[in-house]
Amino acid sequence: PHDLSIMTYNIQMLGIGEKDAPAKIVDYINNSGNDIVCMQEFPQREASFKKFPAYPYYHRHRDVAFISRYPIVNKGVINFDKGHSAACVYGDITIGKDTIRVYSIHLESYRLGKNEQQIYKELTSGNTQNATQGVKTISSRLVTANRNRAKQAQIIKNHMQQSPYPVIICGDFNDTPISFAYHTLSEGMKDCFIEKGRGLGNTYIGEFPSFRIDHILHTPTLGT
């Protein structure tokens, strides 16, 4: 078996809107030394892959992609119901005499915008006078997104169970390790952070509380 390094990264359209962010993100990935990089919120332009010359093999659907130093011998897309913002791609990658299947996923987000962020700020600062209706809106979106992610996770899990090769699944789950979606996808798998990580491992940075919502899971036979 070969050593393999893999990374998952929500690149937020290469940091669009921030002057130096695109170049910094590209340099970070190119210099990371990883064999495979799974990305979410990837620009939907074929030319974007040319920014990663060390990774000649790639696959993308919507805003989800992965790039690889090793050949992709088979690749596909998992489709979800119309109207869902989730996306998932997979590919079978040959490394020497071995083949693995890699999934790059981006499960549905809560779709909380600036208005919801402002409501959250008011709530956390103790200003609840104008936030009642906003709380109802946020609660509704949380419930809907959780239900949708649960369905999406089950569809992906069903596909994973048919894989003829060991599996690595990684990406932006938009959900924590105590969620139904994570539980569904991690059943029978190993979590790289649990195996090798330290601390809380928070991966979300934003207006809302930080959690570990990005994950890398793998078939136990692959080791960590």
Model-derived regions, located:
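Metal-dependent phosphoester-hydrolase catalytic domains
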Residues: 151, 155-167, 173-224
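Alpha-helical transmembrane signal-anchor/signal-peptide segments
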Residues: 2-7, 23-24
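Active-site metal-binding loops of divalent metal-dependent hydrolases
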Residues: 11, 42, 107, 172-173
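Residue-level marker for buried hydrophobic side chains located in beta-strands
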Residues: 6-7, 38, 169
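Structured beta-strand-rich core segments of catalytic domains in phosphoester-bond hydrolases
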Residues: 1, 17-21, 30, 36-120, ...
